[in-house]
Design a protein with these regions (language model features):
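Active-site recognition of the HExxH zinc-binding catalytic motif
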Residues: 3-19, 28, 32, 36
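An acidic intrinsically disordered interaction segment
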Residues: 1-5, 61-80
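Hydrophobic alpha-helical segments and helix-packing faces
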Residues: 2, 24-27, 102
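Active-site catalytic microenvironments for nucleophilic, acid-base chemistry
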Residues: 16, 37-41, 112-115
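Generic structural signal for well-ordered, non-membrane alpha-helices
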Residues: 7-11, 40, 104-107, 111
Length: 175
């Protein structure tokens, strides 16, 4: 339940909107990261301070589920997100529910999120802020997300995501 609840909560945080689904795969990957993050946090918190003393034994189960999920994703050999994304961007834009691939992306996103969770998750609330139902390239989608974030820490997270995908934005090209 925790895993699915965190995933659906991720959609709420991201401001999910019906409409153009071209970049929905990215939101699905963020929501997968939210689930993995929630499992880790519950494992840590419940090992020290469970809601009920007899629930403390569940703490390692959350961590185990997270590990099993990540290890079950079996990355392709020498997986590099930026080059893999360039080769698979059309397939992703056509099918947001490629669960194994969403997991691969989520694990890479999680490595950034866990460095500074608060601004990372708060940045997600701006992900679909400028959605207008029109089709956007992934580069435009991320650029709009960056522009919508009002705080420096949020922008830093989005910039790290942009870099993770090896994307140059118009601002980079003008430097």
């Amino acid at each position: 339940y925790v895993f699915q609840f965190a995933h659906e909560l991720g959609h709420i945080i991201c401001g999910f909107e019906q409409g153009n689904q071209t970049n929905q795969w990215f939101e699905e990957s963020l929501c997968e990261a939210a689930s993995l993050y929630a499992l880790q946090r519950l494992s840590v918190v419940w090992s020290n301070s469970p809601p009920y003393p007899n629930w403390q034994s569940y703490a390692p189960e959350f961590a185990k589920y997270r590990i099993d999920r990540i290890e079950g994703g079996s990355y392709p050999e020498n997986f590099q997100l930026h080059s893999w994304w360039r080769e698979n961007r059309v397939a992703l834009s056509r099918n947001a529910g490629l669960r194994k691939q969403n997991l691969w992306i989520a694990v890479k996103l999680l490595s950034i999120i866990e460095q500074n969770p608060r601004p990372s998750w708060s940045a997600c609330s701006w992900l679909n802020h400028s959605q207008n139902g029109q089709s956007k390239t992934f580069e435009e989608y991320l650029s709009d997300w960056y522009g919508a974030c009002p705080q420096t820490g949020q922008k830093k997270f989005v910039r790290q995501v942009i870099n993770l995908f090896g994307i140059s934005t118009p601002k980079d090209k003008n430097k």
